[in-house]
């Protein structure tokens, strides 16, 4: 009985919009990326302003977490308060439960 009510609660929750962004170079992206991620190099991150709501949950990753940290700062300074640095591609994969897609 408890499980039935738990499922009702879970399925009644509003869906959360989530965007995963790979901020590495084009060559790094082509070597593999997280399933469901979009690619935009960190220095071009503000191009998102017309495409993604400032309320959306955004996770950014790169090779080590450095560039994604810079991109996260740019976004938070621009009002994207739900932007989060997910670290390296491996860390982000674990955090978000996403596989790396290799081309």
Task: Annotate each PLM feature.
Residues 12-15:
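N-terminal signal peptide c-region/cleavage motif recognized by signal peptidases
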Residues 2, 18-19, 25-57, 66-103:
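Rhodanese-like catalytic fold shared by cysteine-dependent sulfurtransferases
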